[in-house]
Amino acid sequence: MTKKQLAPKLEELFASNPGKTLSFKDIFRSLHLDTHPLKMLAIDIMEEMAWDDFITRVTDNSYQLNMKGQVQEGVFQRKTNGKNSIMPDDSDKPIFVAERNSMWALTGDRVRFACMARRKNHIKEAQVIQILERAKDTFVGRLSFDHDLCTLISPSNVLANSIIIPRRKLKGGKDGDNAVVRIVEWPDQDHRNMIGEVVDVLGKAGNNDVEMNTILAQYGLPYKYPKNVEEAAEKISAEITPKDYAEREDFRDVFTCTIDPKDAKDFDDALSIRQLKDGLWEVGVHIADVSHYVTEGSVIDKEAVKRATSIYLVDRTIPMLPERLCNFICSLRPDEEKLAFSVIFNLDEESNVKAYRIVHTVIKSNRRYAYEEVQELLEQNGVVDGTGEPAPAAPKGGYKGENADALIMLDRLAKKLRAARFKNGAVRFDREELHFDVDEKGKPVRCYFKRSKDANKLIEEFMLLANRTVAESVGKVAKGKKPKTLPYRVHDNPDPTKLETLREFVVKFGYKMKTDGTKGALAKSLNTLMSACEGKREQNLIQTVALRAMMKAKYSIHNIGHFGLAFDYYTHFTSPIRRYPDTMVHRLITRYQQGGRSANKEHYEELCEHSSEMEQVAANAERDSIKYKAVEFMSERVGNVYDAHISGIQSYGIYCEIDENHCEGLVPMRDLDDDYYDFDERNYCLVGRRHHNKYQLGDPIRIKVASANLEKKQLDFTLAGDL
């Protein structure tokens, strides 16, 4: 055995025994060093390790690992390439953890660790000495049988070792089934594998329903509704009582409509409009009165708290509330009398709010519109989408279409609101969204882009106005007074470092932007950039990088305003069927209207934090369902060649996004065989050492679809020549 072979074995032996004194005898026995030359070589290497402060001499013939500094705590991050790390609680700089020092911790585990003495020419390393709390104890994957041995194949590949499932713990699971498995025995020094038991068999991998439920299970999201919650929903009466009518404003005779996606079933919101005296318009924003039917602390409410949001996968909705409530009792369906919580505005022709009131109402929607229907009506009356201009004056015979006067007036008022919002410093992000049409088996047959049009923006502006007004009604108080507790939707200013990264990035495309100055100046600079790149090849890429520079919006009782919307006060009031924070806001507004005291801050901040977390988890699941359908769609197009652009660059290859459908795949580094390429992280490019050829973010590129891996939701591309 050479020095080069023996040194790593000695390092691993000491690293695996932190705090333990190892005598020469222990070391020789552990490493099977039974000849005099090998023993002397080991002693020489240990002297060098002690000189490097990697180990400490305890006696003349014993050493122990040098654990430098105090023991700390942090969160473990496992990587498939072996570059594991720990994020210490008191730092934002991760510390490298070699696999041999990981104690087989998994991503998200809270661990206790000690920093090891840094060896010459080595990066800072840590040793996990205790796993304090497991991030999760259930995993989702495919059951794989090899003779009598069953293991769980996880698509994420971030397990330290295999999960073995004894036959008696399979719960009927068969080879090739997707399953949810709970760990019953974690690894230790004697047994490196995890032992698990099947808690739910999802079904045969590849089946659409099974794969969608698998995505939900991977994020710990529900794919079934508890029976007791469904039963509780069945007992709720939809009847509107004489007391309800007496206590509410009656809007049943005022023109009211809903405008939603064509496949929507849960109608959260409706708009009413009528002309008042003195040239004013009364616009009612009517929201389903969920809190009337869902009592705080009930089994339905507890389940809604847990879920916090509805989840929208490509081919299905997993509702926050039981179907009887979200699609029937609460939903503002046409020609049915419904209870609503409403914000009623008196607006002048310029959409200035002259007065408002927040009241409980009874409404009766006259018509259920799809966005496409309203868009068609607007366009046939002279509206040019995206210009911000309302319909021209009505011709002699009047506007064309059912309820055209009302809808065109709503559009005109909405456009005034929108113009004022952007003038006030709101940031404009109009992104295309990838959508799929699927057949009866869930298979994608067509992909297309959806862009927000004037009909969508009509609804958006009135919802924003209602949300802002409700937030102001509680949060805006006289100087010296404390506002009552309310969950706000807050959005912090962008991260200055990320903004500078964005500025450096867009310069490469010939764009300029300012990253300093007031919030308004920054918003103006961002909007100028968005307008300048509109319609260009790099538009989607620049919007993606710009969005990464933004902070994430979240819920909090501590109001800091909303940067993106340029609102000092903002909340979520308009979607209680699909968002729990809206239900919280409804309850608190009712409580305060009835003279109630301010609600408990700590309790509501906890609910806000949970809602923000669940919103992010749901968004991740939704993205995964889109990825799955994109890979499934492209799996029938393997071998096809497409125009694309480089959307991401890593040390292991280049990510490319197909121009015609935004499906993304990887050209692995091994396929770039005309040169050896170095990764220039600062300039977002790969540079060839010999020929200096560059692959840069945003560059056009021609690719061929090489393979589609549904289990991993990954596409692999190869280069297909120059454009």
Regions found by a protein language model. Give the residues of each.
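Charge-lined substrate channels and their catalytic hotspots, especially those that engage the 3′ end
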Residues: 1-284, 291-337, 368, 373-376, ...
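A short macromolecule-binding patch
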Residues: 93-98, 159-165, 662-673, 677-679
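Electropositive polyanion-binding surfaces
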Residues: 29, 180, 185-187, 204, ...
